[in-house]
Structure formats: C-alpha cells, structure tokens
Amino acid sequence: MDADCIAGTCRGLKQTSGLKLVVVDGIPSIVDHVDDEPRVLEQFSKLARDLDVAVVLTDLATRGPLRKPGLGNLINGKAECRYADAILFVYRPEFKCACGGDANKAELMVLKHPWIQPYTLNSVSSPNTRDSRITDLLRPDAQFW
C-alpha cells in the first residue's frame, strides 16, 4: 500500500466513519526510495490538516548502540523536523549492551514538540500484567512556554 492509497482510504473513512487517527507503522514500507520520504511526509502533514486527524508515522533511526537517539539519527531528519509537529523516540536501555538490563523499562524521549522543551519520561511495565505507568511525569528541568 502506498501513501496515495492510504490517503484516499483515510478521506473515505473520514466521511463515512468519522476517522480521528491514522497510524502508519514504518515509513519505509510505503516509500519506494528514501528520497521519496520528504514528499510522503508532506502528503501526510497535509492529510492531517485537511481532515483534522492525528497522524502517527513510525520511522527508523540510525545510531550506535551505546548512545541515546537524537534528531540527528533520523534518516530523513530535516524533512521529519519540517513536517512533524512532535517527534518522540522510544529508547530501551537494555539494548545498550550485552550486559542486559531491565526489559520492562523504556524512556519516551520527546525531542520536538510545539509547546514544550525536550524532555524524557521514564516508563515501567509489569511483566505480570499489561499495565505500564509513567514513573516520572516530567523531569524537573522540563520547561513549558
């Protein structure tokens, strides 16, 4: 399925079912070449504005295993920063090294957002339940404007 097909389907669903959310898991799965990604991002940005829906796109990041990801690790970072209202990374520290770590912990890193400075949320999920909780809502150094 390509971006044009998804956009057309979304327009139909907005009219018939009141579509509110569009999620595409993996931008590379809908673009033929990495050079096409900025056009696709612009297309989904326009779709979000035209239909007044939230659009969530996931993409790959490149980084060394010993560092936390950043905006510079996005394959098409300039285009993603241009068209995205918010950019978040899910970082799982146990993948840093072979020494292990807690597989139930993850950090949600907000690297671009229209209202707040970058910050990190720590999340812990229980292996016995499907519940997860944010262990610290905001770091003390997070600032709102």
Feature map (PLM): residue ranges:
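C-terminal extracellular loops and terminal segments
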Residues: 38-42
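Conserved ATPase-coupling elements of RecA-like P-loop NTPase cores
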Residues: 30-37
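Conserved H-loop
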Residues: 53, 57-60
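C-terminal regions of RecA-like/P-loop NTPase motor modules
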Residues: 3-26, 46-51, 64-145
